[in-house]
């Protein structure tokens, strides 16, 4: 059965290594008959969560802040799969991705009577470091998030050894891994 997939691309670089992972994933997912909507967060005006817990009262506009999250909320609600994509910054996801994901709280946990639907999820991660230790903090964050939301982890692609934009283009195995994950979802 075809799935609706939302990708939150948290790379601040428009043409960085994370973007290449996303393109490979999308190629695989679409070849398997899925529909994919990519949100390039660096191009969007998204404010940080205020922690006000005032959202969730209006399904059409679940957050009190009015910014580009209004484009993401409906796609998120309808998605079967949510893919988080980010470069590693200080052993975590980018600020762009964290900011957007924090704002999903208005939908995932504040809507009266809204049961956060069980979704599938995946993580695409590019980084300069290439050891398992480098990815451990991000893995803990991602697995904790998936567990809290009762999401099924469909896979993680760690693409280490990539610093300069385009480095990953010299590592076809990493791009193939992202494409394969897209195909299998």
Which residue ranges define each predicted feature?
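N-terminal beta1-alpha1-beta2 submodule of the flavodoxin-like/Rossmannoid cofactor-binding fold
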Residues: 1-107, 165-185
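Short beta-strands and strand-loop turn motifs
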Residues: 8-9, 85, 123-126, 158-159
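Short beta-strand elements in bilobed, periplasmic/extracellular small-molecule ligand-binding domains
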Residues: 35-40, 151-159
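Sequence-level detector for tyrosine residue identity
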Residues: 73-76, 89-90, 114, 142, ...
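Short, glycine-/small-residue-rich phosphate/pyrophosphate-handling segment
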Residues: 96, 109-155
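A short, flexible beta-alpha/helix-coil linker loop
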Residues: 127-130, 160-164
């Amino acid at each position: 059965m075809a799935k609706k997939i939302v990708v939150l691309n948290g790379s601040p670089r428009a043409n960085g290594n994370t973007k290449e992972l996303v393109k490979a994933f999308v190629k695989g997912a679409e070849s398997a008959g899925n529909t994919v909507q990519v949100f390039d967060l660096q191009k969007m005006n998204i404010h940080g969560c205020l922690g006000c817990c005032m959202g969730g009262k209006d399904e059409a506009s679940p957050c009190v802040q009015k910014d580009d999250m209004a484009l993401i909320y409906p796609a998120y609600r309808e998605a079967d799969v949510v893919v988080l994509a980010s470069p590693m910054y200080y052993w975590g996801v980018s600020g762009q991705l964290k900011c957007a994901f924090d704002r999903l709280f208005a939908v995932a946990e504040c809507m009266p009577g809204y049961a956060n639907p069980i979704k599938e999820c995946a993580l695409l991660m590019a980084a300069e470091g290439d050891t398992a230790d480098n990815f451990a903090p991000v893995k803990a964050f991602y697995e904790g998030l998936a567990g809290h939301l009762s999401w099924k982890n469909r896979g993680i692609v760690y693409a280490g050894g990539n610093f300069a934009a385009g480095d990953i283009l010299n590592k076809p195995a990493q791009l193939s891994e992202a494409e394969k994950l897209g195909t299998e979802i």
